[in-house]
Structures are given as C-alpha cells and as structure tokens.
Amino acid sequence: MTTRKTNRRALLSGAAVAMAGAAVSTSTAKAADAAPLKKVYRTGPKPATPPAYSTGISFGNLLFLSGVVCRTPGDIKVHTEFALGEIKKQLEAAGSSMEKVLRCTVFLADMKDFAAMNEVYTGKFGDDPPTRSTLAASGIPANSLVEIDVIAYI
C-alpha cells in the first residue's frame, strides 16, 4: 500500500513539475512573440545613419517627445504657437492628443517672455492641463525663443 501511495505521489509530483515547466516555456514564447514595448516615431523617413536623438519614443503606452523649437523669425507668441502645433501633430501621428499629455517642460531663452508664452500655452491641453516646469535656458537650438517637450500616454 505504501508503495502505491509513494508511486502515485511521485507521478503527481512529476506531472506538476512538467506542467509548470510547460507554462514557463509557453509564457516565454508568448513574450518573445509579443510586440516590442519600445517604438520609435519619426517626423520623416528613417535616416541612413543613426541620428543624435529620436523625435519620439513610446514605451508601452507612454510617449516621450523630444523638444520642439521654432526655426522661423517671430516673437515668443509665434514660436510658442508653432512649437505647440508641431507637438499636436506628432502626438496625433502617434495615436495620442494634447489632452493626453501628462508632463510638459518649457525652456525659455528669456524668462521675460513667460507671460506672453503662457497666453498662447493656456488652454491648449484641454480642461485638465499637464504638470509643467518652465526654465530659462541659453543656447536653445535654431535661435528659437522656446523649446517644449512632453510626455503623454497613448
């Protein structure tokens, strides 16, 4: 009788180990077949050589957009409107929107432009705007008066 119980336990124990191993193998295979968590978004065709940075990258359902500047002449209102318009286009191309922005960082060439930038900025993100930091920064590319980057969800 003891031998039968021992054999039965050994059989059940072996079956449990085999099932656990199969479950791990299956979940590992599914993870390998799953879509990658990281996806790169570009505003143009893929460059022939690796660029210095990516315009946008999503990881899971989070989307990170690089800073957007204005390369044309104009005052802070023109530059802010342009940057926010480009951000809106990039968000929508990635399946997001201004209302889904969680975090925004604004870099101003001159903090004296804060009030004028805010006039254009306010209301662009819907009724519940994202968290934001605004900093003075020298050397913004292309002589832009503002650079804005965002983190959103898709």
Regions found by a protein language model. Name each.
Residues 106:
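Active-site loops and adjacent core secondary-structure elements that bind or stabilize anionic groups
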